[in-house]
UniProtKB/Swiss-Prot annotation:
Component of the Mediator complex, a coactivator involved in the regulated transcription of nearly all RNA polymerase II-dependent genes. Mediator functions as a bridge to convey information from gene-specific regulatory proteins to the basal RNA polymerase II transcription machinery. Mediator is recruited to promoters by direct interactions with regulatory proteins and serves as a scaffold for the assembly of a functional preinitiation complex with RNA polymerase II and the general transcription factors. It comes from Candida albicans (strain SC5314 / ATCC MYA-2876). Component of the Mediator complex. Residues 30-59 form a coiled coil. InterPro entries: Mediatior_Med8_fun/met. This is Mediator of RNA polymerase II transcription subunit 8. Its main location: nucleus. The gene is MED8. Belongs to the Mediator complex subunit 8 family. GO terms for molecular function: RNA polymerase II cis-regulatory region sequence-specific DNA binding; transcription coregulator activity. Keywords: Activator, Coiled coil, Nucleus, Transcription, Transcription regulation. Gene3D superfamilies: 1.20.58.1710, 6.10.250.2610. Residues 1-21 are annotated as: Disordered. It holds the Pfam family Med8.
Length: 239
């Protein structure tokens, strides 16, 4: 019995179909990889910071929190990382919005199923959605505060204008009067009477006694300023 030689091109034998080559020339690998690395750095920094705080909360007597300067440096690093990834996302916004992600035939779906479902997710995760809404709320509050501050500036400007008007009005009223000393016309007329002269003499005697007492108790025997001198200095800048 003769045997038919094995023919690999026979239709009954399955052949391996070669996959078409995929063109990745339009994909900015460097930018996407940089974003991924930045996200990984932020995740590691936050994880380390959270572990330090949680360990201290669980064992406050055994594990102490780092110094304030350490936390300040860590926050500065996080801010720098967030600013960097924000700029990269902003510069590649069109690319990230318009790029359709799909697995190639050689993608290891079994080993990286979670990654695949994450990449193909059309709706953001609940925690991300909450973070975005919180950021929008903060921006709305800041905008409202700016408007309120502008209104406050307008109110302050009106107050300044009102103060200027008051000063001008006081100056106009002051120009209509003549001020000599600290007594009214009625008081000056009373001081010319015998009773008024007697009151002035008694007042001067009391002031002299008070000045003598002050000279004994003040440092260096210096004479204190009279209240009228203080008022004159406050009003006219003269002693």
């Amino acid at each position: 019995m003769s045997q038919t030689p094995f023919n690999p091109n026979s239709p009954s034998v399955p052949t391996t179909t070669s996959l078409p080559s995929t063109d990745f020339s339009q994909i900015p690998y460097d930018v996407l990889e940089s974003i991924r690395n930045r996200l990984n750095q932020i995740r590691q920094s936050l994880t380390k910071l959270a572990d330090q705080i949680n360990n201290h909360n669980r064992h406050p007597q055994k594990i102490k929190l780092p110094s304030y300067s350490y936390f300040q440096n860590q926050f500065q690093v996080l801010i720098t990382q967030l600013m960097s990834i924000t700029n990269q996302l902003y510069n590649n916004e069109d690319l990230l919005r318009n790029t359709n992600v799909y697995p190639t035939p050689i993608f290891p779906t079994s080993a990286h199923e979670n990654m695949l479902t994450t990449l193909l997710r059309k709706k953001v995760a609940p925690e991300v959605d909450e973070w975005i809404n919180g950021a929008k709320l903060i921006m709305e509050n800041e905008t409202k505060n700016k408007l309120d501050n502008q209104q406050v500036e307008i109110d302050i400007l009106k107050i300044d204008q009102w103060v200027q008007w008051c000063l001008a009005k006081i100056q106009d009223l002051r120009d209509e009067f003549q001020f000599y000393g600290f007594h009214t016309v009625e008081e000056l007329d009373h001081m010319e009477t015998p009773q008024g002269k007697q009151e002035i003499k008694e007042k001067k005697d009391k002031e002299f006694e008070r000045e003598q007492i002050e000279l004994k108790i003040t440092a260096g025997g210096q004479k204190s300023l009279h209240p009228n001198q203080v008022l004159k200095f406050m009003c006219q800048g003269q002693i």
